[in-house]
């Protein structure tokens, strides 16, 4: 209940409250069989961000999370709040945050007429969504993995550039974290573990760490 109350506080503008994500086929079948008991609960197909590389590159890729009041205030100030109607998530850190306006696209919608039993009678209006743009980075994943392996057991930061053009081909902040934890709102236990860790995995040491310069030659 505490979790849902927190979601309600942050998502007061949304018309829906997610109870559970990523249902299995068995869970879907069980719900459908007993749906008559829960007239106000509905199944909904939904796209979800998944980071297949897990901790690898988490600090430059960043992550998304549920839209909160602070995000809404910023979106309204920028005059783009309307483009987020029907959306629940937004980029919070890294590339996800910096290129949010290009990644999120535009939501579609459908206006329908229903009867007293909530059965669809007809579609009044339908607008297809517009997909966000793809972003291709210059990161060389082989070099990225070599850097990560070299930093196992250590804390620090590393950036590798292509000397021919200055492109960033590896970007490492160690230790790292799994951005998938944040996608649908991080749970309290996981948050405390990350936030209270003496190793500070959430800090992007490339841009926020303070280190002596050492030799520049």
Locate the predicted segments by residue.
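Extracytoplasmic/periplasmic proteins that interact with beta-lactams or build/remodel peptidoglycan
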Residues: 1-157, 172, 176-205, 210
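Active-site rim segments in enzyme catalytic domains, especially the processed small/beta chain
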Residues: 212-216
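Short hydrophobic alpha-helical segments used for membrane anchoring or interfacial signaling
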Residues: 158-163
């Amino acid at each position: 209940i505490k979790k849902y109350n927190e979601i309600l506080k942050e998502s007061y503008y949304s018309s829906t409250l997610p109870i559970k994500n990523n249902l299995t086929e068995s869970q879907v079948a069980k719900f459908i069989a007993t749906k008559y008991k829960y007239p106000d609960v509905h199944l909904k197909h939904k796209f979800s961000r998944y980071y297949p590389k897990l901790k690898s590159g988490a600090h430059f890729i960043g992550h998304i999370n549920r839209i909160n009041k602070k995000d809404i205030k910023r979106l309204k100030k920028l005059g783009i709040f309307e483009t987020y109607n029907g959306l629940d998530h937004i980029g919070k850190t890294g590339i996800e945050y910096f290129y949010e306006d290009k990644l999120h696209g535009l939501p579609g919608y459908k206006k329908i007429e229903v009867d007293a039993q909530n059965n669809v009678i007809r579609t009044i209006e339908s607008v297809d969504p517009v997909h966000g743009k793809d972003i291709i980075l210059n990161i060389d994943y082989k070099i990225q993995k070599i850097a990560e392996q070299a930093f196992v057991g250590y804390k620090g930061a590393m950036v590798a550039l292509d000397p021919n053009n200055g492109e960033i081909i590896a970007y490492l902040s160690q230790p790292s974290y799994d951005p998938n934890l944040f996608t649908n709102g991080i749970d309290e236990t996981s948050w405390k573990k990350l936030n209270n860790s003496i190793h500070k995995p959430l800090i992007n040491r490339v841009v926020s760490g303070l280190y002596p310069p050492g030799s520049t030659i």
